[in-house]
């Protein structure tokens, strides 16, 4: 038999059809309830009880799971972090006024990229919603942080899209169907949403982006369309989109960000032990996010770098002013995100109180900066002089009570004296409550019942309670309403009249106060741009102060940054390890100039080669964000990109071996690097046979030297590379102190090569059994002797080249032109591995190789 759904479930079903791909949180009284498959998913994700409601139209029980409305943010955070899209359906009319079922509507659809609630956001990180569009080998990328209003765009070659996404780490990425990128999950949108139709409705947010980059403009339009789909009603706080150019910033790809542990460590993915953690001495959320943006995009502008350095240098000198400003900044609320919530209509009374409290300090901060002279700090001070915000503080002082409740509907939000109409209603309400409060005393006197009490509950309203022993003294005008085990409850006609006036006044007061609050919030929203400008200035000021504190804590110096190609470091230290080791880190020097720009670095495992390379890269990044650096002297020519090939890592999901991953990363470096780049290579070629690896390492070194000419540090155990005799290539090694069978790593980089790796010593330190160690030492002597013989043979077969260096492969004096032509015309992707092997054997036979055999099958 068909079971008819209840009106509530019919309403739920209609609303659920509007968002079939989202979990629907359906407000019912004091709970948000989920039904059906949504309930099963919600119960499993949140680990809450799964129950059931009435039967569906097929007679099956409907699964039900609910959460308390006051705990929404906590549970919403867990659902969104688990990757779910969540639709919030609210009761949009007062149940008391409803005729029939309460009207409900979806008010928000929350996704990872559209969250604005503080509980769902990381305070010190941006939360970007990205959109990507690919065409003709180019990628248009737009990113919006809805919580702050930051809107940026970048057009890059498709092959650089992964690095660009890694740089900004968006919480959610939109793309048309068919777009895919390894390691990135896309939210597919209809291709028609990636059109410029939205541009005319964007209120000037996109500016002339459609002329500068149609791809980015269409991606930005997709974001704005998506906001409408997720029920975002206002875009007034979104800042005009800013196009970023790769020529303005040092490029740091995904691999470099990971290997250098800029934002997340390699151990557990947290910020512990990262460059961001060490430099982040900011005291406000705006400052921390500003620092993160500087690290994401180190500047290529000498002017920008100089201005920041000047500001830090002045703050280092001005200790008293520095501490005064720091105290004023400490405890400031997140102005950027508060004004975002105000503009979006989500801010509550507590947000406005926090805004008021923070804006009060701005004039004090500006005054404390009045004696500062550096160009950047003077500019920041001017940006803090916003008289319009003085008026806003006065408004909030007049309108808001000192300690309002969280919800604007709970009363006590608006201060007496702000709204005459509200004051009048409150006066009537107070008079009524005062009469009721005095009723108990007057009725005790009138009746002589000393235990008489006046009380209130939600069912009967106000009542007079008389204990049973005193019932004989109850006057005739008392009307019995309720009988208890030891008392009776009564009302009087006058009490009910006053109660009616009180409750009516209370309802009118609550409704009017809510309207007044909404009007106040609207007035605050009209100052959004001014608050955003002040918040940005505070973020930059806090970042300068944070970098100043980091410089003082780490005994850092101001680097010389210029347009040259030199990198000169004296007593340089790894910024993270130096802080952790508290002065125990061994400093090192580095000179890279026209005569020594390619360093071959040899030395044992665990001696510090990788650490040294990383510290050079980190110092370069610090220098180009305008920071001081850990050294006694530093001179750094602008670096356009940093490339790192460090450590072993496989990619099992894609079926790529460690060596394949290494070669892919190496290929990217060789294709993308320029003469102004910094390349750090660690153990290239170790994932294959010794001679294959050595050949690759040698060829790579030649290619970088002759073609790219980038500043390079190449750490290797292939000691043969130290024989590269080319201009600009220099040999350095990690110093070791040998005493008998034991060695001590001195962690110092010294001129000259070493021909020992001390791998067996490291094996002994690791606890490898002694008999294995002894056998390894015997074999090492044999293998090294054989290798020396092979190298001597190779040296006698050098080809006539402009290089005077070691050659490992004997070139035939002439190559068969027919074979060469056949190789040129080969299409490798169309032949099988077996066919390739047969071709290789055939070519060797035709070239007259003695060991060539016919293996055709």
UniProtKB/Swiss-Prot annotation:
* UniProt cross-references to PROSITE patterns, sorted A to Z: DNA_MISMATCH_REPAIR_2 (PS00486)
- InterPro entries xrefs: DNA_mismatch_repair_MutS (IPR005748), DNA_mismatch_repair_MutS-lik_N (IPR007695), DNA_mismatch_repair_MutS/MSH (IPR017261), DNA_mismatch_repair_MutS_C (IPR000432), DNA_mismatch_repair_MutS_clamp (IPR007861), DNA_mismatch_repair_MutS_core (IPR007696), DNA_mismatch_repair_MutS_N (IPR016151), DNA_mismatch_repair_MutS_sf (IPR036187)
One function term, GO molecular function aspect: damaged DNA binding
Q: Which GO terms describe its biological process?
A: mismatch repair
Question: Which residues form each disulfide bond in the chain?
Answer: none
> What keywords appear on the UniProt entry?
ATP-binding, DNA damage, DNA repair, DNA-binding, Nucleotide-binding
Q: Where does ATP bind?
A: 603-610
Entry-linked NCBIfam families: mutS1, PRK05399.1
| Known function | This protein is involved in the repair of mismatches in DNA. It is possible that it carries out the mismatch recognition step. This protein has a weak ATPase activity.
Name the record gives this protein:
DNA mismatch repair protein MutS
**Which organism is this protein's natural source?**
Methanothrix thermoacetophila (strain DSM 6194 / JCM 14653 / NBRC 101360 / PT)
Gene field? mutS
